[in-house]
Amino acid sequence: MKLTVNRIVKNWDGASKIKYTTTGFVENPMGPGRRFAKQNIDNELWEDAFKQFNLTNIKKDPLYGNILMNHYKDDAFTHIHQDESQEGHVHVRANVMLKKPEEGGDIIIDDNTYQIEVNDLWLVLASMEKHGSTPIKNGERLLFSFGASVPEKEVEKILQ
């Protein structure tokens, strides 16, 4: 899917302001070596993440919320999938790479692989785009995922 905004914000200023907890991890049943933990985040930072992509008419994602995702075993990856959304809305994720393994952990969106570095922020229209990640090696992948439910009309503004 082509966007009118840059999909990736390199070295996002807000990355250093993210406060997260690594307690409460739950194993992800969708694959080995994957886990996640729900997070509470400052509203201003959450809004700023989406403003980077010109998305302002947003509400908190009621399905998944904000989460910390971790791949911690070699060969762990996120399978290619599309998420659900509420009718008339798009499930949107603004993700920040907090820690990256020596190999892998890059994102895949609609069959395109994007190399992401620590502190990069990227946008996924999770209910419209097939997305996942490449398998990791030699280290772990830790990312913070801001979740939003965005009216379809708002998302149309950033589509080509």
What are these regions (language model features)?
Residues 1-63:
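Non-heme Fe(II)/2-oxoglutarate
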Residues 3, 91-93, 143:
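Intrinsic-disorder/low-complexity, polar/charged segments enriched in Ser/Thr/Lys/Arg/Asp/Glu/Gln
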Residues 54-78:
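A short glycine-rich, His/Asp/Glu-containing loop-to-beta-strand
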Residues 58-61, 85-87, 114-115, 134-137:
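A general structural signal for short secondary-structure junctions and capping/turn motifs
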Residues 63-65, 77-94:
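A short beta-loop-beta micro-motif enriched in histidine and acidic residues
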Residues 71-73, 87-103, 147:
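Short, conserved beta-strand element in jelly-roll/cupin
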Residues 73-76, 82-84, 111, 128:
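Short, well-ordered turn and helix-capping elements at secondary-structure junctions
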Residues 100-160:
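Catalytic core of Fe(II)/2-oxoglutarate
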